[in-house]
């Protein structure tokens, strides 16, 4: 039997999503909890692996199991065995053809910026703090230059293992609510550090340090060293994964939940 789960987590105290030896990971904690409920070893496949300090409100995973359990076992039962900063949000038994990663047609991230001279207290692990004047309208205008299929060599990590630097961005929106700026970006897939590198570049434009046309220059250069510094991890959320309608997966309100959808 193949089971899909919707997962939410605060990634601030984990060394990323992927299971690793000798360090705590979101995948490791989830598999441990699932294995207790299934009474057999469980390995999960995810829609997108997030880095150290990055959060997820719309992560999707699947796993195969011989265990027959009620839905409440895979939700309430697993949540009882998870740390407080990881939670199962929904469950669905799916066809064998479903794959959390390869069936996905798009991923959506939101990057939350706290734009204020003084650092935050309560939300310090859920937002990235940037001081000074930031023009979100300039950021939004520049962000439109990323839309479409491009070679994102200038915006991927040097250690990125993807065989191709080409990705297609479907839409990018930059909005402000008071002190909070949200960069909302959807694409078919993302390269390692791609969202944070894009945000770093947009911040330089929003601060007035570069013109919006800098985006086109960086895309053409295909050189990571010419782009802006990588933005902090703690403001980044994987908020949604898109799948073909016939899988009929549950849809929740987009996060993070302290922001209006």
UniProtKB/Swiss-Prot annotation:
Which keywords has UniProt assigned to this entry?
Isomerase, tRNA processing
Disulphides: none
EC code = 5.4.99.12
Do you know which Pfam families this protein is assigned to? PseudoU_synth_1
Which residues hold substrate? Answer: 109
Q: Which domain of life is it from?
A: Bacteria
Q: What is the reaction catalyzed?
A: uridine(38/39/40) in tRNA = pseudouridine(38/39/40) in tRNA
User: What PANTHER family has UniProt attached to this entry?
Assistant: PSEUDOURIDYLATE SYNTHASE, TRNA PSEUDOURIDINE SYNTHASE-LIKE 1
Q: Which family does it belong to?
A: Belongs to the tRNA pseudouridine synthase TruA family.
Which HAMAP family does UniProt cross-reference here? TruA
Q: How is this protein organized at the quaternary level? A: Homodimer.
Name of the protein: tRNA pseudouridine synthase A
Q: Which organism is it from?
A: Shewanella piezotolerans (strain WP3 / JCM 13877)
